[in-house]
Amino acid sequence: MTMSKNYPHLLLGVAFLGVSLLSCAPPEAAEERFDVVEATIPEMQRAMEEGSVTSRDLVEAHLLRIALYEERVNAAIAINANALEEADRLDQERAAGQVRGPLHGIPVALKDNIQTTHMPTTGGALAFEGFVPPYEATLTANLREAGAIILAKTVMTELANFIAAGMPGNYSAVGGFGLNPYDPRRDPREGRNDGRPVMGTGGSSSGIGTAMSFWAANVGTETSGSILSPANATMLVAIKPTVGRVSRYGVIPITADQDIAGPMARTVTDAAVLLGVLEGVEPDPHDPATQRCEPPSGGDYTAFLRADGLQGARIGIPRASYYDSVQVPGTDRFRGGMSDEARALMAEAIQILEAQGATIVDPADIPSVMDPDPENNLLTSGGSSVLSYGMKRDFNAWLATLGESAPVKTLTELREWNLAHADAGALKYGQARLDESDEIDLEEARAEYEADRARDLRLNGEHGIDEVMIDLQLDALLFPGSGSAGIAARPGYPTVIVPFGFIEPSGREMPEGFDAKPQPMGVSFTGMACSEPRLIELAYAFEQATMRRVPPPGMR
């Protein structure tokens, strides 16, 4: 059973219960109540171990926050109406001495392109509204087996932002517009006043609900930037894993070449806990890519949470393009760079890294960015058919796994359905990307795709991140915000982003009397394939030295 966007008898009941309890409780009880706002997963586990709180209490507390604030931010597409029953069962297991692990009884949320059999999986597409798939994703099963309670499905950019160019982050026909809790106002500017947020949420995953403490953490997916950019926009930690680290079976795809799921959380600790559960300890036979990386002993990434993790580390600063503008070879154009305010924030981050014992290698420019040969230069590489080709190949293959229950059987049928239901809101921003992908002849376009894929791997991996890290013996590259998203996504390399500060928005002229608010900005540690353990060490040490995350204002 699922609660739809029409909210929600369950939420209203929980809200009423919460208000009643608050009004009846003596002052000393109020002080003793467990506060879920900004609470970490280990803190929740400790409270349950001590008997001061139950999983039911945690679910009720999170549902109460959703009931109080969801209308202001629109974080969820669906709520699990059986969450309290699941919590009761897990509480009974705990009472019997059966604790499954660090996620036992913890409420989490999934992006709505991750299959669940107890809630619909829509990808935000109207054609899939109410659709409950015949099987659940491997990562969903891993979470359930670990005792996690999947409390909700999050808003997302429709079909992971592969339906139309110009679609705002966290908009979908099913979910509407998600709003950034650091400024939950809508954009007042002419031409942009269609309901979209004035402060971007990133996309296509959503960090809104985790930032708001609607649940302990959530799982996003990324093809290029879709975990990192929403984490950056909502002051979250996120781990975008190596492609293959987490099974993609049962996740609505764009392309198997780059798709990956990963944790979004308020702390590095919580993200590390979640990553271990998502990965599992054995490769998934449904996803051969899961053989790429070895999991850590016992699947436990918390072993890498070292406060001294920066001691002796070598961190590279890829100045060209990512910090400073650089001329594109053979042209008079310049690419990249950042605002003075962002530059100052990154300079502060670098100073902190040095103070924590890291050696800063500056510059540590990406060789393919600096290569004078246009054939070997990342900035002149032009477009790539990899995503469009992959969408045609992999989306149709995914639809075939759904059997007769699928609302549509092919990408062509989805396009036709959307056209037939345009008046119902299926095509607010069109479907140009779907059209482009579906018109590809996979056999005729194979050679172009393979050449583009080889170029992507060479310029971003072999002649990019690999070359600079090997030559300079680096542990990681430090990028501003989610700036590493593209270059790390193409070869499928990992990144960990950590909240760090705020910057004034640039290039956003607002109507008189409407003051734009500062927007969050994090820092990212990127490495080569399967380097998550080292990146977690670095990110945790940086987080512990800074502790810059702040919860959204006015939402407590």
Language model features with spans:
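An N-terminal boundary/leader segment
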Residues: 7-89, 95, 343-358, 412-416, ...
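Short helix-loop capping/hinge segments that flank enzyme active sites or metal/cofactor-binding pockets
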Residues: 104-123, 304, 309-331, 382-461, ...
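Structural helix-boundary/capping segments
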Residues: 68, 149, 211-325, 331, ...
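Acyltransferase
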Residues: 59, 88, 300-306, 338-365, ...
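Sec-exported extracytoplasmic/periplasmic mature domains
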Residues: 46-53, 63-71, 84, 88-96, ...
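Glycine-rich, small-residue loops and helix-cap segments
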Residues: 51, 105, 145, 151, ...
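Short glycine/serine-rich loop/turn segments
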Residues: 104-261, 286-292, 318-320, 324-325, ...
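N-terminal secretory signal peptides that target proteins for export/translocation
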Residues: 1-7
